Amino acid sequence: MDVEERLSLVLRYPTEEVITVEELRELFQGGYKLNHYIGFEISGFIHIGTGVVSMSKVVDLQRAGVRTTVFLADIHSWLNNKLGGDLDTIRRVAVTYYVETFKRIIEVLGGDPDATRFVLGSDLYHHNDEYWFLLMDITRHLTLSQVRHSLTILGRKMGESIPLAYLVYPPLQVADVFALGAHIPHGGIDQRRAHILARQVADKIRFYPLTVDGKRIKPVALHHRLLPALNISSKPSSKEELSELKMSKSIPQSAIFVHDSPEEIRQKVAKAYCPPREVEYNPVLELLRIAAFREERKTPLVIKRPEKYGGDVEVWKYEELEAMYKEGKIHPADLKAVTAEALAALLEPVYKFFQGPGAKLLEEMRNIAITR
């Protein structure tokens, strides 16, 4: 695979941006062994945004020859009071439900679950004096204003009254990038500010400098799209507003969970926001794109329609679908029907896992109080 083919894998949907593309191209051209990481708070059930969208980029990176890592951020979750702030519960859920779910999704998407490393935050920090020196070093090079500005990482507006612990979170996240040796830190577009901080301190820190071939570099940040909540009532006016209106595991009606049954998926999609002719921030279109158009199709997607409205339609590419919907040639009800079926087919192996060997994991999650 040549450099441009590798680059196209990284840049394809659902990638929103890479900072910077030219830096990544140079790293690929150099033939360096590159490390990736994406971090997750440990909280409630994994939905399709956290699971399928994120892991689709992990699979793309695997194919591009990048070593991938999923970071299970137990300490961050504790600081942010997830799962009631119970650290033991957070850790247990991280290494059981989260690991098993992500592995199943990677496999469903055509990747290799064994090729991705899973790292628990506590394990990275344990008996690691250099990490704590790194963290302190990072704080020496950040201002209070910079840290407060990045607090949307936590889903909290910086003008609110917040515990001091929350101010530790952004430097901690920046430190993880370097401690993991991540040339490509990855997350949703809502993680952008933290990754910008990492780039800003990259040439200043003394501990865990990020290097290739002995040369210090800045991390190349990779950000994927956020799935809008199913129950949004209007189009977001900005990316910042979208981060507030993304799918949320603590609001069940806003999200499709990866363990949902086909009938639950149909019911949720049927109620989803899907205005006629509107293609921007349309959660149903986004869901169909990730479920049916991530890979080049070998057969057309068939959208069933009544004969009086023109009969069935065959679609090969997402761009065709979007254009037809924008022109009003596809009714929202027909779009919802095909989306629900495509999602149910994609997630069927995950659903069956949680109906069988993974049932105990799901039951434990149902018994845990979920905090947002």
UniProtKB/Swiss-Prot annotation:
GO-annotated biological processes: tyrosyl-tRNA aminoacylation
GO molecular function: ATP binding; tyrosine-tRNA ligase activity
Keyword Cytoplasm: yes
Motif 'KMSKS' region: chain residues: 246-250
Taxonomic superkingdom: Archaea
Keywords assigned by UniProt, alphabetized: Aminoacyl-tRNA synthetase, ATP-binding, Cytoplasm, Ligase, Nucleotide-binding, Protein biosynthesis
One Gene Ontology cellular component annotation held by this UniProt entry: cytoplasm
Binding-site list for L-tyrosine: Y37, Y169, Q173, D176, Q191
Family under the similarity heading: Belongs to the class-I aminoacyl-tRNA synthetase family. TyrS type 4 subfamily.
Subunit details: Homodimer.
Function: Catalyzes the attachment of tyrosine to tRNA(Tyr) in a two-step reaction: tyrosine is first activated by ATP to form Tyr-AMP and then transferred to the acceptor end of tRNA(Tyr).
This protein's name: Tyrosine--tRNA ligase
Organism: Pyrobaculum calidifontis (strain DSM 21063 / JCM 11548 / VA1)
Lineage of producing organism: Archaea, Thermoproteota, Thermoprotei, Thermoproteales, Thermoproteaceae
